[in-house]
Amino acid sequence: MAKVRIVADYCGKGYQLLENGETAGTFLIGAPLQERLCRWNERYEAHCDPLHYEDVSGAGFDFVAFAAEGLAIARAVKRRLPQWTVTYWDEALDWYLSRDPRTYDPTRAEYEITLRDAFTDTTLRSQGGAGGQPR
């Protein structure tokens, strides 16, 4: 099965294809989503200095907002490629987990985006559920 990791990285594209030759050149997500992914990665390169990971206040780079946008992109990729395995490297989670170097395990910052995740309406969740009632 074809696999893609959505991950911001320096000198990257915002994604990494995880299958050898099989999926090379077949990451067909459409121009608008490809451009969104590229802009997201460019913002990481331009504004996220590696030293920002050491800033516990998060004042240098908004990891939470950046990760939320990345998750939205990963969900959109999964909707476009439902047969693919899509994983997402969560920069906010990585930033948080790296606070304790004794227990830091970078693999905990990556998780799979399922079809259920991809089609979940986050606006309902933020409003307290389908009835719109706060929880």
Language model features: what each stretch is:
Residues M1-R135:
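Intrinsic low-complexity, intrinsically disordered or marginally ordered coil/linker segments
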